[in-house]
């Protein structure tokens, strides 16, 4: 089992799958009568190049900059986002790096433990080149259905992850997604 962010994580668990999404401008999707599961308001990509910890571990600062840039482009603050679908590979090195980057990008949030943190890898394993689209599909369905799916196999946080003093909590059961604003906003 993949145990994202958990103290008993044992590493990468492969899965097999593929995913496909159709991206359209909102006005075109509305005009064409398409089913709209979610709207992407902003995104960012980067390359951490020489900042990487190692070949297998990205840079905390570079990840945090990409997350913050996506928030800015979407016109959102960390407080607006109540669910994050993380990469969450369930490795002792990768999960703390990702959590540190998220914590840095959400540093302006005044609330503690208001934002659910999940990883589809706990449900279906790491789909390699399809891992990102699997997380996007999971999140789009969560937005559309109003339910945050459970992150499975989590017992207690990795010793390098301080959930208590962060904006995040690990969502271990399916739960209704009813943010105070009434608008479901997520990061992937």
Where does each model-flagged region fall?
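Condensing-enzyme catalytic core of the thiolase-fold
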Residues: 1-188
